[in-house]
Amino acid sequence: MRTFLFLFAVLFFLTPAKNAFFDEKCNKLKGTCKNNCGKNEELIALCQKSLKCCRTIQPCGSIID
């Protein structure tokens, strides 16, 4: 019975993992379509379904295209 309660508590409080593999890509596969861009991301385009194309901001010293 204790094992069941322990497993229930562990599984109940675990957050579901996000699978980024199936996310919609944009800007030549360098950005992702989201509802809102994160703190370290910039809005670069608009996606379908009123989503925003967000791309991680690169530091000034490492510009890669």
Swiss-Prot record:
Disulfide bonds listed in the record: 26-53, 33-47, 37-54
Pfam family membership, one: Defensin_beta_2
Transmembrane segments: none
Signal peptide residue numbers: 1-20
Summary of the tissues where the protein is detected: Expressed specifically in epididymis and lung.
GO cellular component, one term: nucleus
Molecular function terms, GO-annotated: CCR2 chemokine receptor binding; heparin binding; lipopolysaccharide binding
Keyword Acyltransferase belongs to the record: no
Subcellular location: Secreted; Membrane
InterPro entries assigned: Beta_defensin_dom
Main location per the UniProt record: secreted
GO terms (BP aspect): antifungal innate immune response; defense response to Gram-negative bacterium; defense response to Gram-positive bacterium; innate immune response
Keywords from the UniProt entry: Antibiotic, Antimicrobial, Defensin, Disulfide bond, Membrane, Secreted, Signal
The family this protein is said to belong to: Belongs to the beta-defensin family.
Role: Has antibacterial activity. Acts as a ligand for C-C chemokine receptor CCR2.
Quaternary data: Monomer. Interacts with CCR2 (via extracellular N-terminal region); this interaction may preferentially require specific tyrosine sulfation on CCR2.
Protein's name according to its UniProt entry: Beta-defensin 106
Native organism: Homo sapiens (Human)
